Amino acid sequence: MVPWLAYTKSKTGDTLCWSTNGGELLYWATSTHEGENGHWFSEEDAQNKPELVANGHRDFYRANYYLPVKEREAALKKQAFENIRANPKDVLKNWLSNWGRLIFGFPRSYQHEELIMLVLVGVNAPILLLILVACGIGLKHWRTFPLEIVLLFGVTFIYLGGTSLLPGLPRYTVVIWPWLGLGVAAVLSCHLRLELK
């Protein structure tokens, strides 16, 4: 941790700088050009993918991406906030699309969907249904749960909320499936009874 913070301080001059690509992620998350839905693209894609070139990303990248780190971050964040002010409804659609990418891996801008998406839907949809059922039960009976479970759900939803603001991938949610599983098991074991006759 300390070597990383020392490295980022040497690049940015900021003491607690954890990342130098937040501006880039925010730029793509708020891009509302026709056919785009907040999906992240690499520097190479921005300059070579015909649809992105047509939307002006190549020109923007050439003018701003190769600036020193702090200036690049400032330029990307400035454009992202301009995108939000200019088109808040489409940025909201991008955010909703990002939830789909976090859980199921789609939709993605200008890319063909792959068969692996069916696997993600087949696996994650039942898990998501269990989570929603557990949340409904949990909200109704939240005072009956141990504080640890309430805190676990709180931390999990803070993580999900923050992650949903930037372009997402299913791998970003893999780390919290065990936390959610524990919370769901706690809720369902206390308040759901199945009887076989």
PLM regions and their residue ranges:
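Membrane-interface junctions at the ends of membrane-embedded or membrane-associated helices
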Residues: 136-146, 184-197
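Transmembrane-helix signature of polytopic, lipid-linked glycan biosynthesis machinery
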Residues: 2-6, 138, 155-170
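Internal alpha-helical transmembrane segments
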Residues: 1-15
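Hydrophobic/aromatic-rich transmembrane helices and adjacent perimembrane loops
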Residues: 122, 169-189
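Membrane-interface anchor segments at the N-terminal boundary of transmembrane helices
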Residues: 75-76, 82-152
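Membrane-proximal stem/loop segments at transmembrane-domain junctions that anchor or position
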Residues: 15-97
